[in-house]
Amino acid sequence: MKPVAAGAEVLPADKVAQGTNAEEEPLQQENPFRYVLFPIQYHDIWRKYKEQESCIWTVEEIDLGNDMKDWATLNDGERHFIKHVLAFFAGSDGIVIENLAQRFMSDVKVPEARAFYGFQLMMENIHSETYSVLLDTYITDSEEKLRLLHAIQTIPCIQKKAEWPVRWIGSSASFQQRLIGFAAVEGIFFSGSFCALFWLKKRGLMPGLTFSNELISRDEGLHTDFACLLYNSHIKHKLPRERVLEIIVDAVNIEREFICDALPVRLIGMNAELMAQYIEFVADRLLVSLGEEKHYRSTQPFDFMEMISLQGKTNFFEKRVGEYQKAGVMSTEGTSKKFSLSEDF
């Protein structure tokens, strides 16, 4: 296990259960200068904000013109899987937005972190709009479309999965626990579905859907990176490894049940056992990014995911990031502690 940073304190279990005094955490201390960004005090947080800013995109940049041809060639199981993945994503982004608006934006008093969360909230709105547009495009029956858009209330397996992050929003747990909870949401809860959509890309299907998946998975990787940055570098009171594991393992179990049983990936021709292994691999990657040792020690089972990177390796982002680097926006951005759904470690 990585040593706790200097000045950090690992919380005893009883204090974890009760939460901690927010005033003890630098990120949460009252800050009379929080309404003004400059002078920048937290340069690493600011760099993450600028990195996120350089990755902005809109729904209008996604071409769905060829998707309907592929949609017509899919079998019923494949269409069922895609519909329900999109239905989950459409609602889950709204949950992340609510957490940002109700909790994280008021939890932190550091303007650089608030800037990141504010921009993340906007990007989550773009993700939510994207999934809604995809459903609106693919589903012609208005009644089915409404059922899928309201999946958190109408589809039991999606409702069950959504309950976990919703509980974190209303939780009295400390900020560091909720921070890891939502890192698990964006880093683990989305991983199986992202991977399944990349599988469609490998098969040469649904170019609009799979391109949007590249953009959104990249964003979510950056959001997970940011949570790890805050936890590793700016949280004074670390959680015990046992508590971190409890949160991560719980998220893995829920994701594994969802993508392997409730909405089985075999519907699109994927192996459920390998998908379960992949989710464990991703969870270990998140644990390492949080400064902990691996728990599952599972290896990356999908060769096609080796070609996928959430740090902007697509042509779209090579172009976008390059333009901003010329302007100096990201010229000093480092590459350490990046969270990925594909890279081994």
From Swiss-Prot:
Task: Please list the cofactors this protein needs.
Answer: Fe cation
Residues the record lists as binding Fe cation 1: D93, E124, H127
* Domain of life, per lineage: Eukaryota
Write out the entry's keywords from A to Z: Deoxyribonucleotide synthesis, Iron, Metal-binding, Oxidoreductase
**Entry annotation: catalytic residues:** Y131
Output the GO biological process annotations, alphabetical, semicolon-separated.
Answer: deoxyribonucleotide biosynthetic process
Q: Which reaction is the catalytic activity of this chain?
A: a 2'-deoxyribonucleoside 5'-diphosphate + [thioredoxin]-disulfide + H2O = a ribonucleoside 5'-diphosphate + [thioredoxin]-dithiol
Q: What is its EC number?
A: 1.17.4.1
UniProt cross-references to SUPFAM superfamilies, sorted A to Z: Ferritin-like
Gene3D superfamilies associated with the record: Ribonucleotide Reductase, subunit A
Asked whether the keyword Transmembrane is assigned, the reply is no
The record, for PROSITE patterns, names: RIBORED_SMALL
Question: A Gene Ontology MF term for this entry?
Answer: ribonucleoside-diphosphate reductase activity, thioredoxin disulfide as acceptor
Annotated cofactor note:
Binds 2 iron ions per subunit.
Q: Which residues bind Fe cation 2?
A: E124, E186, E220, H223
Record's function text: Provides the precursors necessary for DNA synthesis. Catalyzes the biosynthesis of deoxyribonucleotides from the corresponding ribonucleotides.
PANTHER family, sorted: RIBONUCLEOSIDE-DIPHOSPHATE REDUCTASE SMALL CHAIN (PTHR23409), RIBONUCLEOSIDE-DIPHOSPHATE REDUCTASE SUBUNIT M2 (PTHR23409:SF18)
State how it assembles: Heterodimer of a large and a small subunit.
**Family per record:** Belongs to the ribonucleoside diphosphate reductase small chain family.
Task: Give the protein's recorded name.
Answer: Ribonucleoside-diphosphate reductase small subunit
